[in-house]
Amino acid sequence: MKKILFLTLSILILTNVLSAQEATYQLSSHILDITQGKPASNVKISLFKQDNKGNWNIIDEKYTDENGRIKNFLKEEKGTDHKGIYKLTFFTEPYFKKMSQESFYPFIDVDFELKDNNHYHVPI
């Protein structure tokens, strides 16, 4: 009986510790390839933030997963404020070249402003 109780408590503690360590992010994105009717995987997306002089500074760069998603832009941490003007650049031309297709858009820029700490999702 003591072993079962100890095992149960150990599992509960471990579960709480692991869930407390799970990071959260303020920004995510998703790309659907409407020509194929499926997610666009392995597409590079760069995240820029505009400074007070109007210049764009790259702050992150990732590739979409097999579901066409990036879930982890702008990690939420205590005392971190992500307010500001941002730009996501979706590098679509290499994706279409890999599929032997022409692309009208070599890249797609999406500009947006974060004014609070809510989660935002930018799909294209």
Language model segments and positions:
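Positively charged n-region of N-terminal signal peptides that target proteins for export
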Residues: M1-I4
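Beta-strand-rich domain onsets/edges
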Residues: L7-A40, K49, W56
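Beta-strand signatures of extracellular beta-sandwich domains
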Residues: K44-F48, K87-T89
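Short, acidic Ser/Thr/Gly-rich low-complexity loop/linker segments typical of extracellular
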Residues: K53-F73
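Beta-strand-rich interaction surfaces with strong enrichment in secreted/lumenal proteins
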Residues: I59-Y63, E76-K78, K98-M99, D109-F112
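Short Pro-Gly-centered beta-turn/loop motif in secreted/extracellular proteins
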Residues: K71-G84
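Feature of secretome-associated and extracellular-like proteins
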Residues: K83-I124
